[in-house]
Amino acid sequence: MSLKFDFSNLFEPNISGGLTDEDVKSVEEKVTSAVRNFVENTPDFAKLDRSWIDSVKSLEDWIINFDTVVVLGIGGSGLGNLALHYSLRPLNWNEMTREERNGYARVFVVDNVDPDLMSSVLDRIDPKTTLFNVISKSGSTAEVMATYSIARGILEAYGLDPREHMLITTDPEKGFLRKLVKEEGFRSLEVPPGVGGRFSVLTPVGLLSAMAEGIDIDELHEGAKDAFEKSMKENILENPAAMIALTHYLYLNKGKSISVMMAYSNRMIYLVDWYRQLWAESLGKRYNLKGEEVFTGQTPVKALGATDQHSQIQLYNEGPNDKVITFLRVENFDREIVIPETGRAELSYLARKKLSELLLAEQTGTEEALRENNRPNMRVTFDGLTPYNVGQFFAYYEAATAFMGYLLEINPFDQPGVELGKKITFALMGREGYTYEIKERSKKVIIE
């Protein structure tokens, strides 16, 4: 079954101040042009090259020997792997025995240089049965170079050959990591040159860890393929990605500068984190394609249902009406728990109901309350968390991001706003060729 998108609560008369047919007509031609551009100049991420799967599967006989895979990556290299792991494996996967995992690997993702995070992962692994997947497209990402150095040092301290416990995923031609592969003989996978990190989850960047923990990567690609095909339809009513872009573009022009994605499943929360990077880094731009200052973008916010009904929904219902809210809903959970009869009349309404019934009722109630308060919202329904459905989700939102970039007349595939911070970091850490002097603040406000 495909994902189902319900955009009804974004439109008049379902909410006051919602989108109208006239609003849609005003940008329909531009959206159609965005779709045609996507078809005629299909981005590499949407081509789903078969070699991506084949290159990963060529390592399967080697990978199956490891009890644990530790991904060392940040940004898209980390978030894509986390999204796959949490959405398509049980939440307690890494606590299961190898037998309970049917021989597949545990997967940990170190996506930060927080020493507590790195230590907590190292404390839980046996280097002798661990593979470190070092991922950096540039081959020089400071955070990944640091964690690579630590992991290599540990392997060498155990008397292990790093080449037998490390897999490097990087650019096919350039960068420090590719140089390492050529000089020292590490096994490697390629990050496609035309695919940016935040669009790379369906490439070897994400596929390796997915295969290692038993996720059907062919089914993942099949879902994405079908979604990309629908994303090439010019009829907006048959194209979920185009409708996502159209509605969010119109609402951005109406002052809705925040995009909330609220997942009603703990397993989907890293899908939301993945979306946050995709939407923020792709669309938050100072300049348009003409070089004019526009300072555009829509701030993505993460929420978890029902948890955040008790922290954020008050604001969403009665605070500034500056948000478009997307619900992620799962109809069928992998496991169920029935609430028992307690004998108390006050709790009888819960007796013999499934926990999932309560969770889905809370999603419906939250959605309806927002509609009553004229807060625009939409829903994406998964019949279950399967590789096919998750592949669709990735593809639809990647296509929607490309369409949104076209509508905003910006480049959704670069990220110039992150470069200065990187350069300053390199300078502070003493990297050759980088200098930066932090200026003394003329006014200081410091409280201890």
Swiss-Prot record:
Its main localization is cytoplasm
Q: Which SUPFAM superfamilies match?
A: SIS domain (SSF53697)
GO cellular component: a single term: cytosol
A GO molecular function term, named singly, is: glucose-6-phosphate isomerase activity
Listed under subunit, the entry gives: Homodimer.
Q: In which pathway does it act?
A: Carbohydrate biosynthesis; gluconeogenesis; Carbohydrate degradation; glycolysis; D-glyceraldehyde 3-phosphate and glycerone phosphate from D-glucose: step 2/4
Q: Which family does it belong to?
A: Belongs to the GPI family.
- Protein location: Cytoplasm
Q: Which UniProt keywords apply?
A: Cytoplasm, Gluconeogenesis, Glycolysis, Isomerase
Catalytic reaction(s) noted: alpha-D-glucose 6-phosphate = beta-D-fructose 6-phosphate
The name of this protein is Glucose-6-phosphate isomerase
- Tell me, what controls this protein's activity? Optimal activity is achieved when His-310 and Lys-422 are both present to open the sugar ring, and Glu-281 catalyzes the isomerization step. Activity is decreased in the presence of the PGI inhibitor 6-phosphogluconate.
The catalytic activity of this protein is classed by the Enzyme Commission as 5.3.1.9
Q: Which residues form the active site?
A: 281 (proton donor), 310, 422
Is 4Fe-4S set as a keyword in this record?
no
Q: Is the keyword Transport in the record?
A: no
Biological function: Catalyzes the reversible isomerization of glucose-6-phosphate to fructose-6-phosphate. Does not have phosphomannose isomerase (PMI) activity. Isomerization proceeds through a cis-enediol-based mechanism.
Q: Name one Pfam family in it.
A: PGI
Question: GO:BP terms for this protein?
Answer: gluconeogenesis; glucose 6-phosphate metabolic process; glycolytic process
